[in-house]
Structure formats: structure tokens, C-alpha cells
Design a protein with these regions (language model features):
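Long, internal scaffold/assembly segments composed of regular secondary structure
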Residues: 61-111
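Hydrophobic alpha-helical membrane-embedded segments
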Residues: 9-17, 104-123, 210, 214, ...
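Transmembrane helical segments that form the transport core of multi-pass membrane transport proteins
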Residues: 89-154, 158, 179-182
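Juxtamembrane inter-helical linkers in multi-pass membrane proteins
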Residues: 17-61, 112, 116-146, 232-239
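Transmembrane alpha-helical segments and their short flanking loops
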Residues: 15-31, 94, 131-138, 178-301
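Short juxtamembrane and helix-loop transition motifs at transmembrane-helix boundaries
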Residues: 57-66, 139-151, 164-177
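Short, small-residue-biased leader/transition segments that mark boundaries at the very start
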Residues: 2-8
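Alpha-helical transmembrane segments and their membrane-interface junctions
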Residues: 79-88, 154-173
């Protein structure tokens, strides 16, 4: 319940900015993983704005194309990064080229697929808004949707494909880290939906914030790995499902879930037993009260 309360309050606070940036009226993203990166985006974006000359690095995905030509295209970046990963894995030339083409295809197709999602869901959102206005006397209601709606944004694609090899290399050499992200890399796109509304699509800011949050996330995953592994082993023992099986001598983790700031804070609070849970309960109630006061104030305007 604490996790849900944290997330719902954050999505209420961020909904207007999200809707204006993505041009998705009445829609918000309540997923904990996406919302947990918003505090980093707010803090670091303000720090960047305080650095003299940093504003000159205001390059979005379109600016990247103009500056680097065809090399700035997400499709070409996907091919290059995919081929480099294949080369680093010491694959043969055929597999290197196949991986490059596959990564490029992903970068090209994701925006097209998400555009279809948006076209299909917009009428539902509009009708729901009409129903809310009729039944709830015009009160403002945000409709929670999947972040898959917006992961096709060009800046998200560029930042994701660049950070995949970078975070793999960092994970190997990062002191104290015991987690190597592999399958979790598929969730890289979901890191950015709530970062972009604050960086305004600036590729440089987005890359730096993404890198910092991922590095911190590696430590979160390492810290939670023992209990994550225990839970997976218990599921495997009860169900026999090989998807939950972690081989002996290994620990499991998930960068696309366990690196969540909200999840880690709640995990640490629960580990403190009654004291931690009491603190979480107080914070949850306080956030509920503050959010209600904000909503009432907005409705009076």
C-alpha cells in the first residue's frame, strides 16, 4: 500500500507536465519503475541549469540528426551499437551483422508500434474524460496508462541504445556491484518516460541522468539480491516453474524492477521491522493529506 500511495501521489504531481510534453491529454503513467526516476530528473535538471554554459548543449533527437547527419538517426545508431555489442561478445561476422540489423530494426519499429497504441487509446481516453465530466461534476481525473505509449520517443530510443553497452561495461568494473544486467536490458526504454518531461528531450541531460540512476540502481539490485533470490527459490519450490529457478551459487536480480528508488526505500523500511514500517506509514498518510489538499485547492480555482 505504501508503494501504491507513493506512486499515485507522484503521478498526480507529474501528470500535467507529462501530458503537455507528450501531448496526451488526460493520461498519466502510474508505474512505480517509471515514477521512481522522476526525483532524479528534477534534482539533476535543476543542477544542470545552474551550470554556466550547459544550456548550450541543448540537443534533442532532431538536433542530433542535424549535427551528425545519418549517424544521428536512431536506426543507424541501433545498427552501430548492436554490431559493437556483437563484436565485444566475440561473435562471428554473420552474427555481428545480424545483431546490428536486429537492433536497428527495433529502433525503427518501436516508434511506429507506439504510435498505433496512441491512436487506438486516444478515443478511449477522450470518451472516459467525457464520462468523468458528466458523472463527477467536471472533476479532473487522470487515466493511468502503460509507459509503452511513449517509449517510442526519439530521445528515449537514442539514450537507451547508447546506455546499453555503457552500463554493461560499468557493471563489470563498478566497485561493490555484484549484478550484471542481461535480460534486464530489455527494460531500458522504460527508464525515460518520466525523465523526458523535465529534460524537455535534451539528449545530453537525459543521458547523464539515465547513467547516474542506472549506476545507483546497480547498488540497489545488489543490496536486494539475497531476498530476491530467496523469493524466487520459494516460488520455484512451490510451482516447479523454471522461469523462477536460479542455479545454485548464483543470486538473482532485475535492473528494471529492483533498481526502483521507491522499491528500495520500502524494502529498507520493511527490513527495519516495526520502526521502518511505522515511518513508511506516517510518510504515506502525510502524502495522502498533502495530495488531497492540493486537489481541493485546484478544484476551487
Amino acid at each position: 500500500s505504501s508503494a501504491a500511495s507513493f506512486v499515485f501521489k507522484r503521478q498526480d504531481l507529474s501528470a500535467d507536465r507529462f501530458q503537455k510534453y507528450y501531448d496526451l491529454d488526460g493520461i498519466s503513467i502510474p508505474q512505480p519503475f517509471c515514477q521512481s526516476f522522476m526525483p532524479f530528473a528534477i534534482v539533476f535538471n535543476k543542477l544542470f541549469d545552474m551550470i554556466p554554459g550547459f544550456s548550450k548543449l541543448d540537443i534533442d533527437a532532431e538536433g542530433l540528426k542535424k549535427k551528425f547527419g545519418v549517424l544521428g538517426e536512431p536506426l543507424v545508431l541501433g545498427v552501430i551499437v548492436g554490431a559493437l555489442i556483437g563484436w565485444a561478445a566475440q561473435l562471428d561476422i554473420k552474427k555481428i551483422l545480424f545483431l546490428g540489423v536486429t537492433m536497428g530494426a527495433v529502433m525503427e519499429l518501436i516508434p511506429r508500434i507506439t504510435a498505433l497504441f496512441i491512436d487506438g487509446l486516444k478515443p478511449i481516453s477522450e470518451k472516459t474524460q467525457e464520462l468523468v465530466k458528466t458523472k463527477f461534476n467536471g472533476k479532473k481525473v487522470h487515466i493511468g496508462m502503460s509507459p509503452a505509449l511513449v517509449i517510442g520517443h526519439p530521445t528515449t530510443l537514442v539514450a537507451s541504445v547508447i546506455l546499453i553497452p555503457v552500463i554493461l561495461a560499468i557493471a563489470v568494473f563498478l566497485p561493490g556491484n555484484q549484478f550484471l544486467p542481461l535480460a534486464s536490458l530489455a527494460g531500458m526504454f522504460y527508464l525515460f518516460p518520466m525523465i523526458l518531461p523535465f529534460t524537455r528531450g535534451n539528449v545530453v541531460k537525459t543521458l547523464i541522468i539515465g547513467l547516474v540512476t542506472l549506476v545507483i540502481g546497480l547498488y540497489f539490485v545488489t543490496d536486494m539480491a539475497p531476498d530476491f533470490t530467496l523469493a524466487a527459490n520459494q516460488v520455484y519450490a512451490a510451482t516447479g516453474d523454471n522461469a523462477a529457478h536460479i542455479p545454485d551459487g548464483f543470486s538473482g536480480g532485475a535492473l528494471d524492477f529492483a533498481s526502483s528508488l521507491f522499491g528500495w526505500v520500502i524494502y529498507r523500511g520493511v527490513k527495519l521491522s516495526y520502526v521502518g514500517m511505522g515511518v513508511l506509514a506516517v510518510i504515506t498518510v502525510a502524502m495522502m493529506v498533502i495530495n488531497r489538499q492540493r486537489i481541493v485547492k485546484e478544484e476551487k480555482k
